[in-house]
Amino acid sequence: MTDTSRRRGGRAVAVAVLAAVTAVVLGVLWLAQGRQQAVPPADFGAVPPAAVSDTGRPSGAAPPPSVAEGAAVRQAPPERVLVPAVGLDAQVEGVGVTQRGDMTVPDDPAVAGWYRYGPEPGSAEGSAVLVGHLDSDTGDLGEFAALRDVRPGDTVEVRRAGAEPVVHRVTARATVPKDELPPSAFRRSGPPVLTLITCAPPFEPERGGYTANLVVTAEPVDARQGP
């Protein structure tokens, strides 16, 4: 092999090494940028905290309903919830409580649960509660994962059976420890609001899962609208 060939071979190796290093650096920068973009926006407004257990259930949401409450006739139960600004679009089904008093949540992370022993969305008073999983057991994000990106004034449309849709505007979003659950989150009286709840990081397997909740509050665009 001539000196010229050796020099060319050395330059080729150097170029290859430089290209590899550059690729690694760019990859690290790309990952760092992605993680920065994944940081949720700062919370805003004042929202009554509500707790969701590691299984996606609001812990201690309400005592088991009485027979009278369970037999209540619903005028316009919700069927679908949409937040166009963040791409949230979930079917809604009515849910109750477990024997422990925990609110149940549909297993499918694409489906939201409406607490059917509380007010309906569009009711004249009280807090209508919708709950959804943040993700599935396989790590796929649920529809309610989009709540982390809502902004003040984003519209929340709830489509109802046998009635016109009701539209709300987001007024608050808060991340709270899941063991903080004031009764106001599930109140049946007072000004009408829509409360949407999901789990929130951090995820701590040794403590059973997510240790916080994301709670979004939205007020009706027309407070006079009812079912």
Give, region by region, the residue ranges found by the protein language model.
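N-terminal export and membrane-targeting signals
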Residues: M1-T22
